Structure formats: C-alpha cells, structure tokens
Design a protein with these regions (language model features):
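Acidic, Ala/Val/Gly-enriched low-complexity intrinsically disordered segments
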Residues: 16-19, 27
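Bacterial N-terminal signal peptides
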Residues: 26-37
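Low-complexity, intrinsically disordered or signal/transmembrane-proximal segments
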Residues: 9-12, 34
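Active-site mouth of glycoside hydrolases
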Residues: 46-281, 286, 291-292
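Boundary at the C-terminal end of the N-terminal hydrophobic targeting segment
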Residues: 40-42
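Aromatic- and carboxylate-lined catalytic core of secreted/periplasmic carbohydrate-active enzymes
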Residues: 67, 305-310, 316-319, 333-464, ...
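Catalytic-core region of carbohydrate-active enzymes that cleave or remodel glycosidic bonds
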Residues: 238-240, 264-265, 269, 273-275, ...
C-alpha cells in the first residue's frame, strides 16, 4: 500500500479518530496533511521526464525517471479558444487529468493556413501558451499533426484542404498527388522540421501523431506513407513517442489493417478508436459501452503487439458517425463516460479510454469529476511493476474485469443488467445491489490475503471489507465498484 493511500485511510478511520487523545489526533492530522500537500506538487525530475514505454513491462507507460504513468484524459478536439485555456487547465488539475490530445492543424491552431509552408508565428504562440499551461498543470499532450481527408479547389466537407490545391496557389491536384509524390512527402517533412525546431525535446509532449484516422483519406496510400513517416518522426523527436491512428474499429473487415498498424515497429503505441454506434456494421458497437470498449482492447491484445494499448477515441455517435449522440443530453450521471474510462484500463489497456465530444460529454453536463474518481481508484498502482494479467468473468448479475498482478488484485465489478439502454431507452433507474458475493479465490496469491478495500466511484468512498474463503460480499451499491486487494 502506498504512503499516500495509507495516509488517506488513517485520516478516514473512525478507530483513529475516536480512540486517540485530541492533541495526538491534531498532530497526526497536520503531519498527514503535509504529506498529502507535498505529494500534490511534482518533483522537478518528474516535470522534466518524458513519457516512455516501460522497459519493465512494455504494455504500460512510465516516465523516464521510472515513475509509473497512466494516461487519464480525453480528446480536446476541436481545440478550445485561447480565452478558455485557464479555465480548462484548472478543471484538468482539479480532476487529476494528466493527458489530452489536440489537433495542431485545426482551426485557429493551424500555423500553415494561408500558403503552403508559410507558418504563422502568431498562431504558434497559441500552441506555445497551451503547452506552457500543460507543463504547469502536469498534463501531457498528444500532438496530432494532420486530419484533412481530401485536397480540393472548393470546400465540399469540413475535412477538405483548400490551400494545397493548384487552383488556390498550392502545388497539388489531388490527395493522391500529395501523398505519393516526392514533392508532397518533402512538404510534410519540411513541416515536421518546423515543429521540431519549435517543440522538439519537449517532455510535455506525450506523443507526435502523424494523422487522425488516416485510412479515411480519399485514397488508400496510408500504409506506405506511414511506414516512411514514422521514422521521420523518430529522427526529429527522438525523446517523444511516435504514433499513427486509423478510423473507428466498427467492422470486422478492419481487423487486418489494425493488426498491420499495431505491429509496425516504429509505431510506439497500439491505438484503437471505437464508438457506441448503432449504425456500425459490427453488432458489438450497438451494445453496452463497457463491453464494446473492452472488446476493442482485447482485439488488440490478441495481436500481441508488445506495446501499450490505448482506446484513444471513444464516445457515442448518431448512426454511422452522423454527429454527436443525443444520449449525452440524457446522461446526467455520466454513465457513458464512466464506462469509457474504466472498461479499457481494467481490460488491459495502459490508460483510460479517451472520450470524444468533450463539450457535450464533459463540459456542458459538468462530468469532469469522473476522471478524479478513476484517478482515486488507481492511485498508487504501479502497472509496470505488477505485470497485470487482465481477466474478464461474466456472470448473470455482473461482469468482473480483473487485473491480477504480482502483489495486487484490482477489479472493476459492473452490474450487467444496467447500461445506457436500460436507463435511457427503457427508463429503468439503476438497481441497488446489496450483499452481492464475489468469488476472488482464483485471483488471490495466498490465504494471507484476507482484507480488501472497496471503492464506490459514484459516491467517492472507500470501505474496508473482509475476504472469507476467497469470497467478498459487497454492500449496497449501484452500477459499479472497484475492489482492491494488496
């Protein structure tokens, strides 16, 4: 058990409060409060450390100083206005968010917005300030370089690039021309040079991402282009991770392309996008969010990529990605978000799921606290040291997502009869579960493990529980709880 977790346990222990003399209680409270305060501020070597793939267990991240790092965050796309920066970073700090993803070529962040290879220093200052605030608030940033899907003379879709087209003074007739020609590839490398000169060797950067969902571009040259450009990223940003992404994994026939990308040597992270989408060709995308998120992670685990897996985009959409789902307006408690955060990590991913639609899913309903609840559940957990084995057990009343480690068993118990359909479509409130017995015997390392702690993320409350004959009985809860055995 970590010092900080133990301190919190003592502070909330009725035994300590009631049995100690008042003077001793006050001294202990002051000392523990000082410890907690010291822990709230990072050491300088942590701030200056880079995110790396752990050498102890390549399925997880750590910092270059050896500290474990679990990316807890979301997609900050479209990018916020500069006047929103201070408010958003305060929210992130208050809710223990340590990661976000941005598109650096989107809207007012796009430095190459008037002419090819002409970079706007004023717009670069917006990115500068964002990264400065990220550093101050201990947030690592994934920098996604491109997202456009076609080069056209006139705008047909939001994702079209106009300035690259010959009709508008650019050098290219088409997307094919840009991706396949020597001129087009040299153009992209020159853009990398500009970013490297300004932002190279920056520990705030979690990773550089070549392109958002590159297999969705108008032509299908993403693989050859990616194979050439990933090493270019590594040469310019040798201390940062380099990654690429594909479109939503919503159809079984995408399995081979996902496997191909996940196994590319120069692609440091096995990323997957997966949404609740009732128009998807894969039926699993129509069902409970914990199930569809977990299955996406397990699909990538089956590829045996030997690198961290992250559900880097997830959310709820109208059928066939025709917009943000109406479900968010009904989700006052954050059921969708909760499952998107917890299910991937407890299925073997290296971090939470990273939600899309941040304004609708997070900001407007003010559901940011769910990140803090996840952070509380995993506080003090060291995934690279534990070498977790993910296990999922499905029973009639619950699904148990277990991470079995060398010294720790961490499990997320999800009510299998509760999901977005039961609450938002059928109108059934979550049932209160009482005296639910869970068999943990197959996950425990010995008879000495007779105590557990249970965290209710809906109430933000820990409770001590006994394990008897390998079984734990859970008291009153709804939807889900986390079980910790150390």
């Amino acid at each position: 058990m970590t010092i900080i977790r133990k301190c919190k346990q003592i502070l909330h222990s009725n035994t300590v409060v009631t049995e100690m003399p008042m003077c001793k209680r006050m001294v202990i409270v002051v000392l523990i409060s000082q410890l907690l305060t010291l822990n709230a501020y990072p050491k300088q070597d942590e701030i200056s450390s880079f995110v790396v793939v752990s050498q102890r267990d390549s399925r997880y991240f750590e910092l270059s100083n050896g500290s474990p790092y679990i990316p807890i965050g979301f997609n900050l796309v479209g990018p916020p206005r500069e006047e929103e920066f201070d408010r958003l970073f305060k929210i992130m700090a208050d809710n223990r968010i340590n990661y976000c993803r941005v598109w650096v070529s989107h809207n007012d962040w796009n430095v190459e917005h008037e002419k090819c290879l002409q970079f706007d220093p004023d717009r670069a200052k917006t990115i500068d300030r964002f990264l400065s605030l990220a550093r101050k608030n201990r947030v690592r940033v994934k920098m996604c370089l491109e997202y456009f899907r076609d080069i056209r003379s006139d705008r047909n879709r939001w994702s079209d690039n106009l300035i690259y087209h010959k009709a508008n003074g650019g050098p290219y007739e088409s997307m094919h021309d840009y991706l396949s020609s020597d001129e087009g590839r040299s153009h992209f490398k020159a853009k990398l040079d500009w970013y490297a000169n300004r932002y190279g060797d920056n520990p705030v950067v979690f990773a550089w991402e070549l392109w958002n969902e590159m297999d969705a571009v108008r032509v299908s040259e993403w693989l050859d282009w990616t194979k050439e450009m990933l090493p270019e990223l590594h040469s310019r940003f040798p201390r940062n991770l380099a990654v690429q992404s594909l479109g939503s994994y919503d159809w079984e026939n995408k399995r081979q392309r996902y496997k191909t990308l996940c196994l590319l040597k120069d692609n440091n992270v096995a990323q997957v996008h997966r949404y609740l989408d009732e128009g998807a060709g894969w039926e699993i995308c129509h069902g409970p969010v914990d199930v569809l998120a977990s299955q996406a992670v397990r699909e990538l685990i089956a590829f045996n990529p030997g690198k961290p897996i992250i559900l880097t985009e997830t959310g709820a959409v109208k059928p066939r990605h025709m917009g943000c789902s109406e479900l968010y307006a009904k989700d006052q408690d954050g059921i969708l978000l909760h499952d998107m955060l917890f299910a991937p990590f407890f299925s073997g991913a290296a971090g939470t799921g990273h939600v899309w639609w941040w304004r609708q899913a997070l900001d407007e309903p003010n559901l940011w606290y769910h990140f803090a609840r996840f952070a509380e559940a995993v506080e003090g957990i060291n995934p690279p040291a534990e070498h977790f084995e993910p296990i999922m057990i499905s029973e009639n009343r619950y699904r148990l997502y277990v991470l079995k480690g060398r010294k720790t068993v961490l499990a997320w118990c999800r009510d299998s009869q509760n999901d977005w359909k039961s609450e938002f479509v059928l109108g059934h409130p979550p049932e209160i579960l009482d005296s639910l017995e869970i068999d943990l015997s197959s996950f425990l390392s010995g008879s000495h493990q007779t105590q557990a702690r249970v965290f209710d993320p809906w109430k933000n409350r820990w409770q001590d529980k006994s394990i008897k004959s390998g079984r734990i009985t859970l008291d009153v809860f709804k939807r889900s709880v986390v079980i910790l055995v150390e």
